[in-house]
């Protein structure tokens, strides 16, 4: 099994090209099921979850051609299976996003209950309740969600009990082909939801309120394929910016989207970083200074993203001062803390809050990745730890970061993949 071996590295310096956003690419690939003609998606990152999504679409009978250079073409003309099996779904939570498109276009869907990162319950009841309000008959048995509808789904007024990115995306795709108007209140406002909505509009969907907490979808009878470019990955961007801040370096993230990262950029500036942005680039310069501690509280967009919490834990571990980090989105999302403590971090957990006293340096150790973003935080810690750090179970990392070791090497880091 692959591992990453990391040696203490100089301050990161140079340019890094940001990949397409995994969390936008996955729902957009699933939206291909809604299109009656060929659908071409570009800027798709080369990641395990993307490969799993392509396998799932092929398993349903869709033709999926990987055209190279981050382009994927999907044709549904021979789609004739409506079951997303356990062996595919268990490795990737986003498989649940096939439910809305299959049900809306074909009236039937059997989807195994999902797997993915083990960071809390992440219930699917919001997805199911919304689809039931649109007329679906749903039962959960033998580990599968079995959904049926006679004719088309019907437009409905849906109020989400809590903000859920996945449920918003599933219901948005389902509503695009429903009969009548659907209103989704308390909808997620994440940039990846906006990207999906813009893709659906390019296919012919009628959606207003994009980017707000109230989405209005006027269902249409059919959607056509189009060519669509996936947005840049804001979490990958943020991860590299934090790595540069922790190593007291200066880097530029190219093909990035500064507008999607305002809360993260604000916290990096609070930590002492000098940040300059252009339309599609972000430069961070620590001017050789140690970062200052910053308090963080995760929240749905436009608040601070939960997917950047672990990386800021590392920043605070090595910062000047004391900070608290409070996680409000997922339980179980401090699994990186025991690993960082093994490297010498001064951290204490109190419920959903982590109290961190900054220290001067960490010591290299053998550590274990437990989920996608936790593994990124351990890599960043390894860059500044004395000696050698080995990060085990990096298959988690490969689910969300494209060519991570090559990108770090390009910035001067001592990182290599080993067996």
Swiss-Prot record:
**Which reaction is this enzyme known to catalyze?**
phosphoenolpyruvate + UDP-N-acetyl-alpha-D-glucosamine = UDP-N-acetyl-3-O-(1-carboxyvinyl)-alpha-D-glucosamine + phosphate
* Listed EC numbers: 2.5.1.7
Which GO BP terms apply? cell division; cell wall organization; peptidoglycan biosynthetic process; regulation of cell shape; UDP-N-acetylgalactosamine biosynthetic process
- InterPro entries, per this entry? Enolpyruvate_Tfrase_dom, Enolpyruvate_Tfrase_sf, MurA_subfamily, RNA3'P_cycl/enolpyr_Trfase_a/b, UDP_GlcNAc_COvinyl_MurA
List positions binding UDP-N-acetyl-alpha-D-glucosamine. Answer: 93, 307, 329
Entry binding sites for phosphoenolpyruvate? 22-23
Keyword set, alphabetical order:
Cell cycle, Cell division, Cell shape, Cell wall biogenesis/degradation, Cytoplasm, Peptidoglycan synthesis, Pyruvate, Transferase
Xref: Pfam families: EPSP_synthase
- In the UniProt record, does the keyword Hydrolase occur? no
Q: What is its main location?
A: cytoplasm
Name the Gene3D superfamilies on file.
Enolpyruvate transferase domain
The annotated pathway is: Cell wall biogenesis; peptidoglycan biosynthesis
Q: Which family does it belong to?
A: Belongs to the EPSP synthase family. MurA subfamily.
Full protein name: UDP-N-acetylglucosamine 1-carboxyvinyltransferase
Gene designation: murA
């Amino acid at each position: 099994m692959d591992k990453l071996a990391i040696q203490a590295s100089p301050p990161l310096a140079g340019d890094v090209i940001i990949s397409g956003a995994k969390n936008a690419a996955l729902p957009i690939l699933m939206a291909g099921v809604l299109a009656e003609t060929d659908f071409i998606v570009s800027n798709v990152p080369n990641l395990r979850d993307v490969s799993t999504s392509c396998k799932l679409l092929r398993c349903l009978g869709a033709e999926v051609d990987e055209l190279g250079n981050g382009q994927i073409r999907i044709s549904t003309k021979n789609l004739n299976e409506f079951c997303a099996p356990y062996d595919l779904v268990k490795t990737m939570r986003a498989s649940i996003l096939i439910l809305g498109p299959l049900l809306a276009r074909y009236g039937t869907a059997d989807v195994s209950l999902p797997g993915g990162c083990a960071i809390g319950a992440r219930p699917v009841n919001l997805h199911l309740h919304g689809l039931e309000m649109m007329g679906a008959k749903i039962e959960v048995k033998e580990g599968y969600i079995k959904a049926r509808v006679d004719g088309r789904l019907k437009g409905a007024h849906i109020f989400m009990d809590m903000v859920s990115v996945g449920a918003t995306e599933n219901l948005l795709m389902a509503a695009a082909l429903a009969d009548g108007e659907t209103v989704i209140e308390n909808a997620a406002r994440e940039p990846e939801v906006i990207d999906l909505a813009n893709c659906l509009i390019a296919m012919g969907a009628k959606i207003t309120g994009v980017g707000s907490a109230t989405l209005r979808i006027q269902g249409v009878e059919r959607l056509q394929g189009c060519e669509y470019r996936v947005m840049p990955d804001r979490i990958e961007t943020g991860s590299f910016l934090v790595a540069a801040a922790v190593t007291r370096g200066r880097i530029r993230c190219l093909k990035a989207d500064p507008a999607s990262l305002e809360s993260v950029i604000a916290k990096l500036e609070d930590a002492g970083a000098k940040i300059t942005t252009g339309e599609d680039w972000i430069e961070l310069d620590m001017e050789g200074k140690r970062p200052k501690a910053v308090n963080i509280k995760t929240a749905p967009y436009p608040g601070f993203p939960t997917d950047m919490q672990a990386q800021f834990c590392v920043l605070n571990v090595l910062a000047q001062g004391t900070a608290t980090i409070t996680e409000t989105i997922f339980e179980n999302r401090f699994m990186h803390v025991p690993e960082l403590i093994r490297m010498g971090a001064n951290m204490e957990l109190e419920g959903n809050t982590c109290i961190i006293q900054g220290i001067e340096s960490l010591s290299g150790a053998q550590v274990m990745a437990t989920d996608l973003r936790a593994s990124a935080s351990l890599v960043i810690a390894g860059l500044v730890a004395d000696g050698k750090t080995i990060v085990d179970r990096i298959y988690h990392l490969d689910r969300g970061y494209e060519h991570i070791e090559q990108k770090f090497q390009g910035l001067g880091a001592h990182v290599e993949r080993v067996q």
